[in-house]
Amino acid sequence: MTTKTDYTNEEWLEIMKTPIYAGFYVIFADPSFTGMLKEMKAMGEAIQKADPPGHVKDLVADIAADYEQMTEEKESFAQDQIPKSADQETAKRYILDKVREGVAIIAEKAESMEVLAFKQWLVAVATAVAEAAKEGGFLGIGGQFVSQREESALEEISNTLGL
């Protein structure tokens, strides 16, 4: 199993961004102001309080520890990297590419079971984001916790990761 010390600082930064990108992908799929706040909070909690598969526990613990030490930059950490002039489809492609890159860095140094477990954890983070806020409805009445767009986003993430 790999840990933070197995990666260069540049590699580690990209690995750290990967679960954030996965969460942002879901947020961008069906954006709403109040939902976004709940979803960003859920993303942070999913990263920090993760219960990942055994093959990736140490790696995720290192990510969670570093994420917890971050301050204001948490919200802008990955979002600042997304091209400002990009339309939604371009931004979504960019985010999925960044998720692939983070997984590829791990795949270079980790065993296949650890890579699979990391991918599963990324989907779990994205799912926690999708389930964080009701979408649709009016004044909190009606709606559903995972919208069709969010379900599609989760499926796209899973497909991108080969799950």
Predicted regions and their residues:
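Small-residue-enriched hydrophobic alpha-helices in membranes
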Residues: 1-163
